[in-house]
Regions:
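Catalytic cores of alpha/beta
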Residues: 74, 78-100, 182-218
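Glycine/small-residue-rich loop that forms an oxyanion/phosphate-binding "nest" at active or ligand-binding sites
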Residues: 54, 62-119
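Conserved anion-binding
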Residues: 12-15, 20-24, 98-173
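Conserved beta-strand positions in the central sheet of alpha/beta enzyme cores
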Residues: 49-52, 79, 102-103, 127, ...
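Glycine-rich, proline-tolerant flexible connector loops at the mouths of alpha/beta enzymes
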Residues: 47-65, 105, 167-177
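Glycine-rich phosphate-binding active-site loops on the catalytic face of alpha/beta enzymes
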Residues: 84, 92-113, 169-171, 200-203, ...
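Conserved, mostly hydrophobic/aromatic
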Residues: 9, 40, 48, 93, ...
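Charged helix-capping and loop-helix junction motifs
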Residues: 61-68, 143-152, 177-185
């Protein structure tokens, strides 16, 4: 079964969504992310993807209090990303209840530090974030495109022991036009043991089933849930079917 991971993106302590990573497109869905997390848990969700968008923009973790409230008031397994750029940021994330931390920009800009984290904490706790636009890695909250090509970038980190990768196609994210299934298929063909977490573009349960059919192990979804195109009841039913 494909692992179903809803996302909570945070700006100013509120649950928001962007379109294609554009901060000007911000839409607030709920003032209280903890209530959102509790509702998800009540419908059988076990894992949550929490993104500190303020952190991503300001290059250090900002919304750790929200992370702490979610992890202390629910039993959800939380993977956390956004602004984790230093040992101190990583420590803050783990101390506030994150079970896993995603590093994206840091893996491009400071690979030595990211690899150190991988060695110290292991591939169960450190996730590689590969945010792509035209198959190039984007950094700094998706505002900048790097010269890193996706497949050489993946190869480098797979060889260093990374096992879990969240891959977001920025052109799809928040657009509700379907995920980049062909991209994910190509990644899985090349790296058969990768625990690939698809992110971006999911607009319906059909999209989730299509990813599952393509062999994608896990999916992150957000806007479709907040816009009512996917309901928590549907997610609960899908999990009960297995």
């Amino acid at each position: 079964m494909i692992e179903l991971i809803p996302a909570i993106d945070i700006i100013d302590g509120k649950c928001v969504r962007l379109s294609q990573g554009d901060y000007d497109s911000k839409k607030v869905y709920n003032e209280n992310p903890v209530e959102v997390a509790k509702e998800m848990e009540a419908h059988g969700i076990r894992r949550l993807h929490v993104v500190d968008l303020d952190g991503a923009a300001s290059h250090h973790v900002v919304n750790y209090n929200v992370l702490n409230r979610i992890t202390s008031q629910t039993s959800l397994i939380v993977d956390f990303g956004g602004g984790v750029k230093s040992d101190e940021d990583l420590k803050i994330a783990f101390e506030n209840g994150a079970q896993m931390v995603t590093g994206g920009s840091i893996a491009v800009k400071n690979p030595e530090l990211f690899c150190h984290w991988l060695e110290v904490y292991g591939s169960e706790k450190i996730i590689l974030g590969a945010d792509v636009k035209d198959r190039k890695i984007a950094v700094n909250g998706w505002k900048d495109e790097s010269a890193c090509e996706l497949f050489p970038f993946l190869k480098e980190y797979v060889e260093k022991g990374i096992q879990k990768v969240i891959c977001t196609d920025i052109s799809c994210d928040g657009m509700l036009q379907g995920p980049s299934i062909e991209l994910y298929k190509a990644m899985l063909e090349k790296y058969t043991d990768l625990y690939l977490i698809a992110s971006g573009g999911v607009s319906s349960m059909e999209d989730i089933r299509a990813l599952e059919t393509a062999g994608v192990p896990a999916v992150i979804f957000g806007k479709a849930l907040y816009e009512g195109r996917i309901t928590l009841k549907e997610i609960e039913r899908m999990m009960q079917d297995y």
